[in-house]
Amino acid sequence: MAAAAAETPEVLRECGCKGIRTCLICERQRGSDPPWELPPAKTYRFIYCSDTGWAVGTEESDFEGWAFPFPGVMLIEDFVTREEEAELVRLMDRDPWKLSQSGRRKQDYGPKVNFRKQKLKTEGFCGLPSFSREVVRRMGLYPGLEGFRPVEQCNLDYCPERGSAIDPHLDDAWLWGERLVSLNLLSPTVLSMCREAPGSLLLCSAPSAAPEALVDSVIAPSRSVLCQEVEVAIPLPARSLLVLTGAARHQWKHAIHRRHIEARRVCVTFRELSAEFGPGGRQQELGQELLRIALSFQGRPV
């Protein structure tokens, strides 16, 4: 596995947090704990099962043995080899990492975007990095990723020494399209999903069969739980590729909790354009220009 790049003492003293965001570095300076590290009240934890596509109640919990469908998640394990993983991270580490919120560092390859005003600029954007060409080509070989053409790549670097995390959030839907694709490198972690919608989730007995047998094995719902009290954990092995679509992309917020970063982790997220920038869309010409630049694979971090 790729060795983690050493960080200087100066880097571990620097902080990129703003507003309510914090990391271990600024918390030591402030002498406070982040509120999201405290156990949330009335939260029931479920674990996503990639074999069935269901979220299953954790062992020894009130909902052990109960589950609900969790569509919109595709997990491809061993998408890259250990050797490819090491080379990808080595190439990333040749370029500078910028400090970011909540103990993260980042490298961005994409247009400059003002999401609030829904405006973007292509100045300075010269494409995705050359080392992503093979990654993008390989994605298109998998069902569900046909025709996936990313116009933005964001590399995020997490490490336990900085207390890296990312708060629950939904990715923008004005510019970014239906499929959100992330490559998890260097260490396993957990993506935590939550939903703030009112109402309840209907639970069934947890399925134990293969997906094609679920129709016959699942009984009618007989329990329910409030959406706002549920968190679904999606385990992400190192070198795995995660695709979020549908409800998992647009309705469930995703986060990485600090406690789930036990070693250096690099996440590479790829985003495609929304329909507004696609064929027949209001900004089709701009979308074509963004694709032309992105898929030249001549980029450096912006």
Curated annotation (Swiss-Prot):
Changing H169A: Loss of function mutant that acts as a dominant-negative mutant when overexpressed, leading to multinucleation and cleavage furrow disorganization. It is an enzyme of class 1 (oxidoreductase). Fe cation binds at H169, D171, H254. Changing H254A: Loss of function mutant that acts as a dominant-negative mutant when overexpressed, leading to multinucleation and cleavage furrow disorganization. It catalyses: an N(6)-methyl-2'-deoxyadenosine in DNA + 2-oxoglutarate + O2 = a 2'-deoxyadenosine in DNA + formaldehyde + succinate + CO2; N(6)-methyl-L-lysyl-[protein] + 2-oxoglutarate + O2 = L-lysyl-[protein] + formaldehyde + succinate + CO2. Gene3D superfamilies: Alpha-ketoglutarate-dependent dioxygenase AlkB-like. GO terms for molecular function: 2-oxoglutarate-dependent dioxygenase activity; actin binding; broad specificity oxidative DNA demethylase activity; demethylase activity; DNA N6-methyladenine demethylase activity; metal ion binding; protein demethylase activity. Widely expressed, with highest expression in pancreas, ovary and spleen. One of its GO terms (biological process) is actomyosin structure organization. The modification N-acetylalanine is found at A2. Keywords: Acetylation, Actin-binding, Chromatin regulator, Cytoplasm, Dioxygenase, Iron, Metal-binding, Nucleus, Oxidoreductase, Phosphoprotein, Transcription, Transcription regulation. InterPro entries: AlkB-like_sf (IPR037151), ALKBH4 (IPR032857). Belongs to the alkB family. Actin demethylase activity has not been directly confirmed in vitro; however a number of experiments strongly suggest that ALKBH4 acts as a protein demethylase. Interacts with ZFHX3, MLLT3, MLLT1, HSF4, EP300, TES, EIF3C, MTMR6 and PSMA6. Dioxygenase that mediates demethylation of actin monomethylated at 'Lys-84' (K84me1), thereby acting as a regulator of actomyosin-processes. Demethylation of actin K84me1 is required for maintaining actomyosin dynamics supporting normal cleavage furrow ingression during cytokinesis and cell migration. In addition to proteins, also demethylates DNA: specifically demethylates DNA methylated on the 6th position of adenine (N(6)-methyladenosine) DNA, thereby regulating Polycomb silencing. This is Alpha-ketoglutarate-dependent dioxygenase alkB homolog 4. It comes from Homo sapiens. The gene is ALKBH4.
